Amino acid sequence: MLIDQYLDAALLGLIEGLTEFLPVSSTGHLIIFDTLLGFEGPPGKVFEVVIQLGAILAICTVYFARLWKVVTGLKDDPGARHFAMAVILAFLPAMVLGAALHGVIKAVLFNPTVVSIALILGGVAILMAERLVPAPRYHQIERFPAPLALKIGLCQCLALVPGVSRSGATILGSLLMGVDRRTAAEF
């Protein structure tokens, strides 16, 4: 039994590692595989949080210098303040909507059927967006107008549906609003 749990944990860790940095929902994939493996309940949820911490640490490591420059430049650097304001504006819609709808989201949307549909629709959206992307107008987060950051945050609200990738929703929304690919991925 213990070996089965280790194999389940290794498989879920592999799934997280393969999907976290792609514009697909790593959480959605974990929900589906949790169900398939019977790895549910509080221990399964704690495990998901722990393996996702690795991805967060990786992002912090890769972007540490840039984030540190923003933090230390908040007082004197207008670009750092603008960057921080853009991030805050982009975060607000999902925070407010997520707090308001948390119970409904957990009760209705956290199931493999919803996740599967969201993953399929996300793939279709990526394919369609490739044909609709306008020429880029925005190349630096430090120069994002406030309304653009807020609109990107509204796109992020789509990721409140399990199976919709947060990075996928924000990258696609950013691209469709004229942000270049690299900047969209960084934001």
Curated annotation (Swiss-Prot):
One of its GO terms (biological process) is cell wall organization. Its EC number is 3.6.1.27. It is found in: Cell inner membrane. It catalyses: di-trans,octa-cis-undecaprenyl diphosphate + H2O = di-trans,octa-cis-undecaprenyl phosphate + phosphate + H(+). It is an enzyme of class 3 (hydrolase). Belongs to the UppP family. Catalyzes the dephosphorylation of undecaprenyl diphosphate (UPP). Confers resistance to bacitracin. PANTHER family: UNDECAPRENYL-DIPHOSPHATASE (PTHR30622:SF3). This is Undecaprenyl-diphosphatase.
